[in-house]
């Protein structure tokens, strides 16, 4: 009876185990080097055997011969090992392999990510947007990457904990809350008056209040250009929002004796958990989180835990870190504030710890300054609170690893935090947390500034994409049910945005072209959804597959063979994408597979195939490809569509 593990994963496991043992090489090295050869004529799988055989007691020929016997013992009669030019090449007998795959498909098996033999508990913290305005394009990329990572790691067999860090402490949350205090309205009341989501209303109040404060302080400094800039922004904000609330905020800020002093005092009181600041700021931030949850729900993203920054302060965790720093030999003063001497930690701790040095890689030319912990006014910095949060994530979950999805602009602070943890004795945490950074994303001709209230919200982007999708679905399905059109267009829009923000790789800046990411002829999610729908249509027209009649030898034909083997690689491809934290590799694989499928079925009809054995075999191939594309899309947060 065929194993429930897919054939290629089973083969890969046997090869990795045997070669690792006989060559005395770490299994992970073998697994990484086992790959399709550069040229098809070499075979279906290859390994640089001579590179390692020279230092082993066995000859390369004897290793290959012994391997052949091992494979037969394990029932793998469809894989033939050969030795050519120092390489172990494996050639698949597609007739025998097809027979095994057909039996699996008949039993209900579908390809899925190969499970790890070493499952871990992994925290993925992502999105964690500042709760003072709606989610924007940058957050969309963060969410798309973070959720794809979580899905991949979970599919790989890891225990994944998704966390959102609520950044409610600091100046920005106070400024937004001050605006509501001065205006006399609540976030929900204002949202109702403006006819917008509550997070959009808070974003508007934050921008108005920030620029009102900026006008006052710039006038005191005599900075006329800043005054003019703030007034220009305020004029535009007035046109976009509630004029009565706008006038109240402006008048109230103008009448304050010391507006900046008031902001600082509110910050200090909130850090201490004093009323009425505690209820005011918590109320405003909670309202924004309502808007976040609505948007993220639409985007297909959810979280296991929402961690409030203020809770870390009020629980004493932040003070514990500060006290540990005060007792540390690395305590110093920097810019009249207490700090940790990061350069000294690098010299005296990192440089003497080879494992830490190889894990926490420092850019050669980067000068890393001390990490300030507490300002001269007694308030903490966000990096201090991040230190406490880093420890908290490990302790509360028992995590083996923590992955923080945070923008590339935070590389220096994130590096400082890891080094500070190392210096304070939190070595395990420092070595097992990762800054998963990503570059910016923009729309052509649109600039972003939350302080000016200028940003492309994720809500707006999804509406733009959906409107275009509705028109496309309507044109392809005249007279279709309206609810189905709306539902399908929504899935296309969400999938298009998510896929476009993952596919290029995290370190490539993106300029998002909404028309292009929806194009069925481009490397897009809609193209993959269309391919999936096309496969569904073929299978519907074909009817039930009779696997007893399906003739696996018919898959030996060139393009069929290539497509068959490529589809069977999915469990290993997605496993490697999970291990490498590279969802873009899975995206590239799916596009390549879809290209192969679309090229094949247009030239080699399934429905009109005259020979019954080949027709059922080709239908089974369509089902295999459809299953792979569907599972791959789901791992990237894109919903497959039976019809478009």
UniProtKB/Swiss-Prot annotation:
Keyword Acetylation part of the UniProt annotation: no
Keyword check for Ligase: yes
Catalytic activity reported: tRNA(Arg) + L-arginine + ATP = L-arginyl-tRNA(Arg) + AMP + diphosphate
One record GO biological process: arginyl-tRNA aminoacylation
UniProt GO molecular function: arginine-tRNA ligase activity; ATP binding
SUPFAM superfamilies assigned to the protein according to its UniProt record, in alphabetical order: Anticodon-binding domain of a subclass of class I aminoacyl-tRNA synthetases (SSF47323), Arginyl-tRNA synthetase (ArgRS), N-terminal 'additional' domain (SSF55190), Nucleotidylyl transferase (SSF52374)
GO cellular component, one term: cytoplasm
HAMAP family (alphabetical): Arg_tRNA_synth
Similarity field: Belongs to the class-I aminoacyl-tRNA synthetase family.
Protein name: Arginine--tRNA ligase
């Amino acid at each position: 009876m065929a194993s429930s593990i897919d054939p290629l994963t089973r083969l890969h496991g046997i090869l990795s185990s045997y070669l690792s043992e006989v060559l005395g090489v770490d299994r992970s090295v073998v697994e990484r080097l086992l790959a399709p050869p550069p040229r098809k004529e070499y075979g279906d799988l290859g390994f640089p055997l001579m590179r390692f055989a020279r230092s082993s007691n066995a000859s390369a020929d004897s290793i290959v011969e012994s391997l052949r016997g091992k494979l037969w013992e394990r029932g793998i009669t469809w894989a033939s090992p050969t030795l050519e030019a120092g390489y172990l090449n494996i050639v698949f007998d597609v007739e025998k392999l097809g027979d095994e795959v057909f039996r699996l498909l008949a039993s209900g098996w579908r390809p899925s990510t190969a499970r790890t033999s070493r499952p871990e508990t992994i925290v993925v913290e992502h999105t964690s947007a500042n709760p003072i305005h709606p989610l924007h394009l940058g957050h969309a990329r963060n969410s798309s990457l973070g959720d794809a990572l979580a899905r991949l790691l979970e599919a790989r067999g890891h225990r994944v904990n998704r966390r959102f860090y609520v950044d409610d402490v600091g100046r920005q949350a106070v400024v937004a809350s001050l605006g509501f205090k001065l205006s006399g309205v609540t976030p929900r009341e204002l949202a109702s008056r403006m006819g917008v989501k509550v997070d959009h209303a808070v974003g508007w109040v934050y921008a108005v209040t920030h620029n009102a404060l900026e006008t006052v302080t710039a006038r005191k400094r005599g900075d006329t250009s800043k005054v003019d800039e703030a007034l220009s922004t305020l004029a535009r904000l007035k046109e976009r929002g509630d004029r009565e609330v706008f006038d109240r905020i402006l008048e109230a800020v103008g009448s304050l004796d010391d507006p900046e002093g008031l902001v600082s005092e509110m910050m200090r009181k909130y850090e201490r958990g004093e009323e009425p600041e505690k209820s005011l700021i918590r109320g405003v931030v909670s309202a924004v989180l309502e808007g976040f949850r609505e948007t993220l729900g639409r985007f297909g993203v959810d979280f296991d835990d929402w961690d409030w920054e203020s809770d870390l302060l009020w629980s004493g965790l932040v003070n514990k870190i500060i006290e540990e720093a005060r007792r540390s030999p690395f305590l110093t003063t920097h810019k009249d504030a207490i700090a940790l001497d990061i350069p000294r930690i690098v010299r005296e701790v990192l440089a003497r710890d080879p494992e830490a040095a190889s894990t926490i890689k420092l850019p050669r030319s980067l000068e890393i300054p001390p990490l300030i912990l507490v300002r001269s006014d007694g308030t903490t910095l966000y990096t201090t609170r991040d230190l406490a949060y880093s420890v908290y994530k490990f302790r509360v979950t028992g995590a083996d690893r923590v992955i923080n999805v945070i923008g590339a602009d935070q590389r220096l602070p994130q590096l400082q935090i890891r080094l500070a943890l190392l210096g304070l004795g939190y070595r395990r945490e420092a070595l097992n947390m990762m800054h998963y950074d990503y570059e910016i994303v923009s729309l052509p001709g649109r600039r972003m500034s939350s302080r000016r209230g200028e940003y492309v919200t994720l809500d707006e982007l999804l509406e733009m994409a959906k409107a275009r999708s509705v028109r496309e679905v309507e044109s392809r399905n005249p007279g279709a049910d309206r609810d189905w059109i709306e539902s399908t267009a929504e899935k296309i829009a969400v999938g298009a945005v998510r896929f476009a923000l993952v596919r290029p790789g995290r370190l490539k800046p993106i300029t998002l072209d909404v028309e292009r990411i929806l194009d069925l002829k481009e490397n897009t999610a809609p193209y993959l959804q269309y391919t999936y729908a096309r496969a569904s249509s073929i299978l519907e027209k074909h009817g039930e597959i009779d696997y007893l009649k399906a003739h696996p030898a018919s898959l030996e034909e060139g393009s069929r063979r290539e497509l068959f083997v490529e589809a069977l690689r999915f469990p290993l491809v997605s496993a490697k994408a999970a291990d490498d934290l590279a969802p873009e590799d899975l995206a590239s694989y799916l596009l390549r597979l879809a290209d192969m499928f679309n090229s094949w079925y247009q030239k080699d009809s399934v429905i009109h195939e005259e020979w019954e054995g080949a027709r059922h075999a080709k239908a089974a191939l369509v089902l295999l490809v459809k299953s792979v594309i569907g599972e791959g899309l789901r791992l990237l947060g894109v919903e497959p569509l039976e019809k478009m």
